[in-house]
């Protein structure tokens, strides 16, 4: 084999497919192809195609040839402007309930589960219609990062096998190490990696999301996948280098509605609530889950939630898919008063689907049985991954100080038992926690207490003040990324007692902790 022949193939891969490979692998691959052909003469075009086929079936970790910009997975805000090819290890549809997806794969789903004796509430015209969202775990063989289906991408589907090769076409916006992908940003080249078919099968990924035991038998793969081929001869060469093997990590679960479509409603339409809102029929059954709205949030708004601390953390904790949220109004027999405040979902639950890598070494050594003093907790900001890696849930109510943002608002803002009620999921980038926003916090954001609101809403002259306060509260919650004092009860659910800007001292403490963990 001549050196010129290898250079021709390398130039063809770069010019036609934007594929970059190490010369050692290319040399070994060409030698193996010629040995399989008994050293017979192979036309250059056919040789090019066979090398491409071998690359499509190769785990890029074996090549260890970086093509992505350095430390792009840690970038808070940047743009990937060039073209490059990466490998998709796994993908997950985070717009669908993980449990329902697992049932469909196992063939245990039942259509009767969707039948209810209670009349379902009709979606209102101004409510945003949710869309599909796929989260992709990507690698160039050296760096791991995620891709989010920011706009519908017809070329992608949940049946793509692990190891599929993708061509990324810039410019692509990158936020917090996540590629925000549109249809024009991605081309599916095909391929698969045999070793990853079982490790990252859909059933295993979903089991990890739900916190269920992983299935021991391999998932039955759909028809039409690329057939496995013999070893290209590069394995012996790659075995001499230190390789990083993929690790299957659990993904936090996201509970969503099943009937998603591809329509999108801009934020302006979503926020325009009609004047006769209160005249519309309301769903007064407090046991029913309120569907979350899936907004199309512009990139400028995403920039407002950038975390000022550069922290690499582990996968978050999981939500319980079977948990029922009983309102306190059930105890006293009163029905909650729903206020016209649509629930929002930041980034389409992007952060809830993230698989992160490194954990700051701040795990709790023990779990105290005594209640922590809130002032003492405020002195030391904590990470959710560290708290949840210790004794969790705590054996007694405890107050923690977290730098966090609101990932999802659960349900509608309402008045129940004379106080404001609103559920949410918060994240500090290392984990996720279901919380209730305290009445004091909501009253400060709205500008009126629940009792004052009841009175003012009956006064037509001042009703607009309440509506303005609620809209202000919504905007503040959407952009909120600050220090939160959170009280966690024995069930692991929290209450956000207060929120305040991060101080210089707290910022320095967290930066110091991250640097110590990296050393």
Swiss-Prot record:
Principal location: nucleus
Superkingdom assignment: Eukaryota
Coiled-coil segments on the chain, per record: none
InterPro entries to which the protein is assigned, alphabetical: RMI1_C, RMI1_N, RMI1_N_C_sf, RMI1_N_N_sf, RMI1_OB
Localization of this protein: Nucleus
Keyword tags: DNA replication, Nucleus
Family from the record: Belongs to the RMI1 family.
Protein name: RecQ-mediated genome instability protein 1
Species: Danio rerio (Zebrafish)
């Amino acid at each position: 084999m001549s050196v010129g022949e290898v250079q021709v193939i390398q130039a063809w891969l770069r010019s036609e497919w934007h594929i970059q490979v190490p010369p050692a692998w290319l040399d070994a691959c060409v030698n193996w192809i010629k040995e399989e052909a008994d050293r017979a003469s192979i036309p250059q075009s056919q040789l090019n195609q066979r090398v491409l086929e071998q690359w499509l079936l190769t785990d890029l970790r074996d090549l260890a040839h970086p093509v992505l910009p350095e430390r792009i997975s840690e970038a808070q805000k940047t743009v990937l402007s060039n073209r490059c090819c990466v490998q998709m290890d796994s993908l997950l549809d985070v717009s669908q309930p993980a449990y329902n997806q697992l049932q469909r794969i196992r063939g245990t789903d039942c259509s009767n589960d969707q039948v209810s004796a209670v009349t379902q509430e009709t979606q209102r015209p101004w409510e945003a219609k949710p869309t599909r969202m796929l989260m992709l775990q990507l690698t160039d063989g050296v760096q791991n990062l995620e891709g989010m289906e920011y706009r519908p991408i017809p070329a992608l589907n949940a049946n793509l096998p692990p190891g599929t090769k993708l061509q990324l076409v810039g410019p692509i916006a990158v936020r917090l190490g996540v590629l925000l992908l549109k249809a024009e940003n991605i081309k599916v080249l095909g391929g698969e990696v045999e070793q990853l078919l079982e490790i990252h099968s859909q059933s295993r990924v979903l089991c990890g999301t739900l916190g269920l035991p992983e299935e021991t038998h391999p998932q039955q793969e759909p028809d039409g996948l690329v057939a496995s081929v013999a070893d290209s001869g590069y394995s012996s060469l790659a075995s001499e280098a230190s390789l990083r093997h993929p690790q299957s990590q659990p993904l936090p679960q996201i509970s969503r509605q099943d009937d998603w479509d591809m329509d999108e409603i801009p934020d302006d339409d979503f926020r325009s609530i009609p004047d006769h809102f209160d005249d519309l029929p309301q769903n007064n059954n407090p046991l029913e889950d309120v569907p979350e709205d899936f907004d199309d949030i512009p990139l400028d708004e995403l920039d407002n939630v950038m975390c000022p601390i550069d922290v690499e953390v582990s996968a978050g904790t999981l939500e319980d898919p079977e948990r029922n949220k009983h309102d306190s109004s059930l105890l006293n027999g009163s029905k909650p008063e729903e206020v016209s405040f649509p629930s929002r979902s930041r980034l389409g639950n992007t952060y809830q689907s993230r698989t992160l890598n490194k954990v700051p070494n701040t795990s709790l050594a023990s779990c105290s049985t005594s209640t922590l003093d809130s002032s003492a907790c405020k002195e030391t900001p904590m990470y959710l991954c560290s708290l949840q890696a210790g004794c969790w849930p705590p054996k007694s109510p405890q107050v923690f100080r977290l730098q966090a943002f609101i990932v999802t608002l659960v349900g509608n803002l309402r008045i129940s038992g004379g106080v404001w009620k609103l559920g949410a999921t918060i994240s500090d980038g290392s984990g996720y926690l279901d919380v209730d926003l305290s009445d004091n916090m909501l009253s400060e954001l709205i500008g009126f207490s629940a009792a004052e609101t009841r009175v003012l809403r009956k006064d037509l002259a001042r009703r607009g003040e309440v509506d303005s306060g609620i809209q202000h509260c919504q905007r503040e919650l959407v952009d909120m990324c600050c220090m939160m004092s959170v009280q966690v009860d024995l069930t692991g659910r929290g209450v956000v007692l207060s929120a305040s800007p991060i101080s210089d001292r707290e910022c320095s403490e967290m930066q110091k902790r991250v640097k110590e963990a990296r050393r």
